[in-house]
Amino acid sequence: MRVAACLLGWTVLLPGTVATACAQPIALAAYLAVRGPAADLVFHYGSAPSQVVELFRPAGRGPFPVAILIHGGCWQSRYGGLPQFRAIGARLAAQGIAAWNVEYRRLDEPGGGYPGTYQDVGTAIDWLASRAAALRLDTRRVVAVGHSAGAQLALWAAARARLPPASVLSVAHALAIPDVVSLGGLPDLEHDAQAIRQACGVDVAALTGLPDDNRPDVFSDTSAASMLPNDTSVIAITGELDAVAPPELAARYVDRVRAAGDPARAVVVPDAGHLDEAVLDSPVWPILEATIREVLHLPAR
């Protein structure tokens, strides 16, 4: 009742209670205006404009634990993502955590979709693995943090070792990502297809490709839900007022992960919407910050 009322703009007063204003999640225009400082280093892992990754590196000698940041935006460039995650990257770097802020080709860019989007994310993470020593990064302490569409990609990236050998996305030595924080994620391309279509106007076929004789199951190498178990711990954080990826989607995915034998938990944040999950000035940030520090075995602040 409370969530529905807030979404409709009502204030509900029950007997014996005091009227309070409903939470107001950050609006899209305000989210798109969010910017963080410039990264310490920028790498181009391909020739396309979106094939870049940014490094926010802490001061000091290192080696530093790493948070791989994969922004969302309905797999479409008009919704931004990279600039907004710069603020989180800079905040993490100030705490001694390196942030690897990944950009990738999206559905409305040449080469985006299946398989290009996945290849971009995988390549960006492979760059981290191959350059970690020179950049003073500790790949034994890694967490992937993805928001919305980026959560789908982060969970997929952590499961790359489970890719069918015949898949064009398969790699010989994928970086182990022991923990993934999914923020308002849409991780199950098969069962979340309707939610993805309603929220993003995207047909999941653009994200999975079409089946053929050599690849009859298009989810086997694109959807993390079909790549379980994968020895990854999942923490699914969702705003109570998230209308794009409602908390029940996270709960269903967590149940599926647990049923497969991997650890997972769901966290619902009161008074937070979908875009609040990706900004510092929100009820989500303190929980996200504490979660990142927890999985990287850093002391609580």
Task: Describe each region flagged by the PLM.
Residues 81-100:
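Short amphipathic alpha-helix adjacent to the substrate-entry channel of hydrolases
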Residues 272-282:
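Catalytic histidine-centered segment of alpha/beta-hydrolase-like enzymes
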Residues 126-194:
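Primarily recognizes the serine-hydrolase "nucleophile elbow" in alpha/beta-hydrolase
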Residues 236-238, 242:
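Short beta-strand/loop motif that positions the catalytic acidic residue
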Residues 27-32, 38, 48, 191-226:
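Mobile cap/lid helix-loop segments that gate and shape the active-site cleft of serine hydrolases
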Residues 112-133:
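Alpha/beta-hydrolase active-site loop
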Residues 243-252:
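Conserved alpha/beta-hydrolase "acid-adjacent" motif
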Residues 23-61:
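N-terminal cap/lid segment of alpha/beta-hydrolase-fold proteins
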